[in-house]
Every structure is written in structure tokens, then in C-alpha cells.
Amino acid sequence: MRPSVLSISAERVLAPIRNAVLAHAGYGVIPVSTVEAALSILRARHVCAIVIANSVPIPERRRVCSEGHNKRIPSVVLDPYDQRDEDESELHVNPLDGPEVFLDALASLMQRDHRHA
């Protein structure tokens, strides 16, 4: 069974590309465009990780990261501006560093989380 990744983004161009990269890397992608939809998925389904685009406003990002933290689901924020603002995410990755850096960071985060479970 492929690990499921919740991908949250309101971006119309970048989100499908990012989701295709995740799927090509072997992840089952659950794409959503709103925080409310993301929170609903987190309450109803098993998710291995959360990927949050920079397009999600910081207060909304904080809500999702907090819910993920409570459920012990690691989260990665794709953030070229490094706006951490105490959002409880596990990791911030600059998407301009390329898909390999993003995928490596996600894989190492999920492996670390799996070892601590």
C-alpha cells in the first residue's frame, strides 16, 4: 500500500505539478484546495504526511499543522520565504531547491516519524 500524502494548495498551476511529482515518487496523493477540506480529510482518513503550499495563509497553515501534530502526522511546508511563524510544521522546504530536495526531505521525515511510532 502506498503512503498517502495530503497535499494542500490553492495554486492552479503548481499544485497539479507537485501532485504529479508526489505520485510519480510512489505516494498516494490526496489533493485539496482548502483548509476546511484538509481538516475533514485528516479527521476521516489515514494520512502519512501533510504537504502545505505557501499559498495557504499562515493562520490557516497553523490550524492544519496543529491538527497534524495532534495526530502525529508530519507536515512539510513549501515556503520560499522561510515564514515559520510557529506553525508546528516539522519542516520548511524551499520549493525553488527542486523536487529532489523536497522528496528527500519528505521521505526522511516520514522515515523518522515511522521509527518513532
Give residue ranges: language-model regions.
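Conserved acidic segment of CheY-like receiver
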Residues: 2-12, 18-22, 50
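Structural motif
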Residues: 8-12, 52-56, 79-81, 95-96
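Conserved dinucleotide-binding and phosphotransfer motif residues
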Residues: 24-25, 71
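Short hydrophobic/Thr-rich beta-strand motif most characteristic of the beta2 strand and flanking loop
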Residues: 26-33
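Acidic, metal-coordinating helix/loop segments flanking the phosphotransfer/catalytic sites
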Residues: 33-49
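His-Asp phosphorelay/catalytic-motif detector in bacterial-type signaling
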Residues: 46, 69-78
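Conserved phosphotransfer microenvironments
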Residues: 52-70
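Output/docking surface of receiver
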Residues: 74-117
